[in-house]
Regions:
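Cap/lid and interdomain-hinge subdomains that line or gate substrate/regulatory clefts
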Residues: 24-28, 60-63, 68-79, 90-95, ...
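Conserved, well-structured core segments that form the ligand-binding/active-site neighborhood
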Residues: 140-314
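C-terminal structural cap/anchor segments
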Residues: 322-373
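Short acidic, glycine/serine/threonine-rich loops at helix termini
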Residues: 14-16, 106-110, 132-140, 189, ...
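Short, structured active-site "lid" loops
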Residues: 44-63
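Conserved, well-ordered active-site substructure
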Residues: 368-424
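N-terminal basic/disordered segments at the start of proteins
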Residues: 1-44, 124-129
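Short beta-strand segments
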Residues: 4, 50-52, 97-98, 122-127, ...
């Protein structure tokens, strides 16, 4: 299985279902790491590869090119047409194009580039476990139309959030597919209905899904579509459909490689938050309330010119001091009147540069926002991750593939997760969940006390 994602947290939250199902799963941050993982897959050492193309902020044409190149290089396609980039080839590997459940990024251009190579795009971005559903080709976030949400208004104000016109604008022939009236059908009959759309020339089939049961039905039908009807297609979805696929034992052989065992670590935990969403803000507030850990809010003005700003050295030292002393720390990007969503990658890279000298002290890293996680791992020289488990849906736990850093990493998309997501991640890394289940309050209190440090928001106070 090859998962092609446009950011790191998305790659992880999509692929984690396969690790949970007992399949060894690697997230690669670049082409070289992905090729190495593909070689491991060919040698039956890896079952699932999730490649972060880092294309969310690129121009649509560049993002499309990266997605197509990834499939050509890693898809295992056979035949002259596939190798020439013309027509649909026969692939030894299944393709899952991961998209954001709130439709951020260049996913339309990427799907349009992949469709001629991989066949029918089965588009199902619903993720009911996180409140994302699809009805009549429209995404809803906890019952609210996507176009009316904070996330959409922040990044896409004035643009349509409906799936069908978005895909048709890219030149794809589309159709809507409602699962609700077909819920009583067996997967083989549902697969026949899917195949009819493919044979009618549909290039992107938009699938409604209100529940995990709907996604499970689609997952089972698509296996029939491939294995029995031999239709060429690829999945386009979020972590929701991926989890249902991962739960199907027939997707992999019985001898598929299993995940590696996690290694226990001791030391401070850094929570790094690049997202400015209200969701992340609430998660940070609860984390501080429950743990009492120190928080540093780095001004964007420092990050915009981190190499030359006169206060950069002070911020770097302020980040390092509590970590060197063994205390946990929350660091996040501030917001000012000059804020522009397009500068997110630059600010995240600058923040990672301030943190990098202190990574050696860390036992755990919690990174919120795909750009933030990728920037921090790149600065630390980590090119791929082995997925281990998850704290809650969409919050993945991993460790570096080579484990040179001896670091446990938790990744989460910014506007994602419950209010307890960051606190739950911290508890997971501290090992408090097991202690709490066993009623060991003394252990919990000792671990919590170890995280406390004097509260501060600026090294300049």
């Amino acid at each position: 299985m090859l998962i092609v994602a446009d950011d790191l947290s998305g790659a992880a939250d999509c692929a984690i279902g396969f690790a949970n199902a007992g399949r060894r799963t690697v997230v690669a941050l670049g082409a070289d790491e992905a090729v190495e993982a593909a070689n491991d897959a060919a040698a039956d050492r890896v079952a699932v590869i999730a490649l972060d193309t880092d294309s969310r902020r690129l121009a649509p044409a560049d993002a499309a090119s990266r997605a197509a190149q990834a499939w050509r290089a890693l898809g295992g396609t056979q035949g002259a047409n596939a190798s020439a980039g013309v027509g649909v080839g026969t692939s030894q590997r299944r393709l899952y194009k991961k998209i954001d459940s709130t439709l951020r990024g260049n996913w339309v251009a990427e799907v349009a580039a992949l469709q001629p190579l991989a066949g029918l795009a089965i588009v199902a971005p619903a993720f009911p476990a996180t409140g994302r559903t699809v009805r009549d080709g429209r995404v809803f976030v906890r019952g609210v139309p996507l176009g009316e949400t904070e996330t959409w208004q922040l990044e896409h104000a004035g643009k349509t959030a409906d799936l069908q016109p978005m895909l048709e604008e890219a030149g794809l022939r589309t159709a809507l597919f409602a699962v609700e009236p077909m819920r009583d059908l067996q997967p083989d009959l549902l697969a026949q209905a899917l195949a009819e759309h493919a044979r009618a020339g549909v290039q992107a089939l938009i699938v409604d899904a209100q529940s995990e049961a709907d996604l499970n039905l689609i997952a089972r039908a698509t296996l029939v579509l491939r294995e029995v009807l031999h239709e060429a297609f690829f999945w386009v979805g979020s972590g929701g459909l991926a989890r249902e696929l991962a739960a199907l034992p027939e997707l992999f052989g019985n001898d598929a490689p299993a995940p590696v065992a996690p290694l226990r670590r001791e030391g401070p935990i850094l929570t790094l938050v690049g997202s400015l969403s209200a969701v992340s803000g609430a998660q940070c507030a609860l984390l501080r309330e429950r743990t009492g850990m120190a928080e540093l809010v780095v001004p964007p003005a420092v990050l915009r010119n981190v190499d030359s700003h006169p206060e950069s050295a002070q911020w770097r030292a302020a980040i390092g001091a509590p970590l060197a002393a063994g205390s946990d720390l929350l660091v996040r990007i501030g917001r000012d009147d000059a804020f522009d969503p397009s500068e997110g990658a630059h600010l995240s890279t600058a923040l990672a540069a301030l943190v990098e000298p202190h990574v050696c002290h860390l036992a755990g890293l919690i990174a919120t926002g795909g750009e933030t996680a990728r920037a921090m791992l790149s600065q630390a020289g980590i090119g791929s991750l082995e997925l281990l488990s998850e704290v809650e849906p969409g919050v993945a736990v991993a460790q570096p593939s080579d484990d040179v850093r001896r670091l446990t990493v938790v990744t989460k998309a910014g506007a994602f997760g419950s209010d307890h997501a960051l606190y739950g991640a911290w508890l997971h890394l501290r090992g408090l969940q097991e202690a709490t289940r066993n009623g060991s309050q003394a252990d919990s209190q000792r671990a919590a006390h170890a995280s406390r440090a004097p509260e501060t928001n600026s090294p300049l106070n």
